[in-house]
Amino acid sequence: MAAPALRPLILICDDELPLRELIKAVLGDGYRYVEAEDVGQAEEALEESKPEAIVLDVMLPGKSGLEFLSELRAKRRKKPIPVVVVSAWQSADDQRTALDAGADAFVGKPFDPKDLASVVEALIAA
């Protein structure tokens, strides 16, 4: 296992604590984590840390995850952070909307743990 300081840092932004805990359990000990319950906390986490990837819920209190993602992409054009959007809304239109907003990947809830883990791993390795 990599030394703690060398493990990639992932920002998990979801308003539900049990889901944040599940995502950490699914992704495992190979990563470090910073958590946010809403967009404001996610913005603070981005200022204070340098995550290698973001796992982002769509439905958040206040500003939506997709609004945050669109703003993030507009601000960070030179070195974008890979973003995986997770959402219970899974229609083709919902997925297209997330990808159009700047998501690198979309994983529907409930998700297969292997799917989420492989998507995050691939985005960090890219």
Describe each PLM feature range:
Residues 17-34:
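Two-component/phosphorelay signaling modules centered on CheY-like receiver
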Residues 61, 91, 110:
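The feature encodes the CheY-like receiver
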